[in-house]
From Swiss-Prot:
GO terms for cellular component: cytoplasm; small ribosomal subunit. The keyword rRNA-binding applies. This is Small ribosomal subunit protein uS14. Gene3D superfamilies: 30s Ribosomal Protein S14, Chain N (4.10.830.10). It comes from Chlorobaculum parvum (strain DSM 263 / NCIMB 8327) (Chlorobium vibrioforme subsp. thiosulfatophilum).
Length: 89
């Protein structure tokens, strides 16, 4: 499991992205890159990492489910993900 501080940092970044989204878009359209540069670094969407909602794992995530591959497999085999079943042909 990822450290709690890493998960918390990512959550703060998500909040900043949401807070500054409209302003960033407005500045981009105006071409005011100097003002864009003065915004907080973490308000850029590229700094947000997709993480597993259960474990906080930062790699191997299925965006549709919000889970890492390990938790996805575990929950799918337990039948806890509706509409998901093991392939067989």
């Amino acid at each position: 499991m990822a450290r709690k501080s890493i998960i918390a940092r990512n959550e703060r970044r998500k909040e900043l992205v949401e807070k500054y989204a409209a302003k960033r878009e407005e500045l981009k359209k105006a071409g005011d890159y100097e003002a864009l540069r003065k915004l907080p670094r973490d308000s850029s969407a590229t700094r947000v990492r997709n993480r597993c909602v259960l474990t906080g794992r930062g790699r191997g995530n299925y965006e549709k489910f919000g889970l890492c591959r390990n938790m996805f497999r575990k929950l799918a085999l337990e039948g806890k993900l509706p509409g998901v079943r093991k392939a067989s042909w």
